[in-house]
Curated annotation (Swiss-Prot):
GO biological process: translation
InterPro entries (alphabetical): Ribosomal_uS15, Ribosomal_uS15_bac-type, uS15_NS1_RNA-bd_sf
Keyword field contains Translocase: no
Subunit and partners: Part of the 30S ribosomal subunit. Forms a bridge to the 50S subunit in the 70S ribosome, contacting the 23S rRNA.
Pfam families with a match to the protein in the record: Ribosomal_S15 (PF00312)
Transmembrane segments: none
MF (Gene Ontology): rRNA binding; structural constituent of ribosome
CDD domains cross-referenced by the UniProt entry: Ribosomal_S15p_S13e
Physiological role: One of the primary rRNA binding proteins, it binds directly to 16S rRNA where it helps nucleate assembly of the platform of the 30S subunit by binding and bridging several RNA helices of the 16S rRNA. Forms an intersubunit bridge (bridge B4) with the 23S rRNA of the 50S subunit in the ribosome.
Entry-linked SUPFAM superfamilies: S15/NS1 RNA-binding domain
Family listed: Belongs to the universal ribosomal protein uS15 family.
UniProt name for this protein: Small ribosomal subunit protein uS15
Organism: Ehrlichia ruminantium (strain Gardel)
One GO term describing the cellular component: cytosolic small ribosomal subunit
Amino acid sequence: MSVTPERKSELISEYCLKKGDTGSSFVQCAILSERIRNLTEHLKIHKKDFHCRRGLMVLVCRRRNELQYIRRKYGNDRYLALVKQLGIRDVFH
């Protein structure tokens, strides 16, 4: 359910804004999206894991807040590019 260190370093290198950037909103959003995908796969198998389902809802809210921040700070074009790159729906249009 968590992201492996190898996968996390791949995500960091793919979404970083500059070398050594591990905490930007783009990287955080990518890592949250990976965690959400992992939890979704877990919940397909374990349908009655309600504790995990609540954790999924918390992660979705955190990602939505990060996406709102990216849209507000960096503009709509970079936001839409990130949404397309992550393969998620645009919730604000």
